Amino acid sequence: FFNDVGQAAGYYPRAESLFDACPSIRATVQSLFGADNQNIWFLGYEVFHKRAGAGRHTPFHQDASFAPFHGKHLVRFWIPFERTPKSHCLEVIGGSHRGPLFNPNKILMTDPATHAADGVDDTTPCFDKEEELRAMPRLPDILADPEAYDVLSWDLDPGDAVAFHLASLHGNAPVDARHPERNTLILGFFGDDCIY
């Protein structure tokens, strides 16, 4: 398992360079944000490389629960480098971006490699002070009862993208012998209504 994170500060104050290289990104982000949004900024990127045996299902979580900014104009694109079947793709809980914001997973926040172990509780709260527990409810155990949730996933080809709001509950299906490797690029953008 490998993860690289790059933040936009200093080298992409606005997304112009990225938009010049791939103009369809601007149109897609603008269509998601709506006509009332005037500006689009590049939030940052992540690169994930995951091989079979290097991890199990990435726990469901919301990126917004540990981000220092909020708003409706927040989107991430999950882009695979190889054909990725639905059974091994990103999984998003439909409508979960509408709330509530859950307490992030402690294991995922403190030691992502640990979540490879079987028997790890994927819902253990990261923020455990009494006021934090009241403000942010514990994550639901989606994997224990996936039929109770609107779990969305897709068959994707290289260059396809899944767009999701930072408050969407999402996790990654595991890689295994049937799909032994997954490489993905995540691009994030934000718009006018975001506050820090």
Protein language model annotation of sequence segments:
Residues 46, 51, 62, 79-83, ...:
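Short, structured patches in soluble enzyme cores that scaffold and shape functional sites
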Residues 52-54, 83-86, 161, 192-194:
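Short, charged/polar surface micro-motifs in flexible loops or helix N-caps
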Residues 76-79, 94, 179-195:
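A short hydrophobic beta-strand segment most commonly corresponding to one strand
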Residues 1-60, 66-68:
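Non-heme Fe(II)-dependent double-stranded beta-helix
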Residues 57-65, 168-172, 187:
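Histidine-centered catalytic micro-motifs
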Residues 77, 164, 170-178:
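Short beta-strand His + acidic residue motifs that chelate non-heme Fe in jelly-roll/DSBH
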Residues 62-78:
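Acidic, His- and aromatic-enriched active-site or binding-groove loops in soluble protein domains
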Residues 85-169:
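Double-stranded beta-helix
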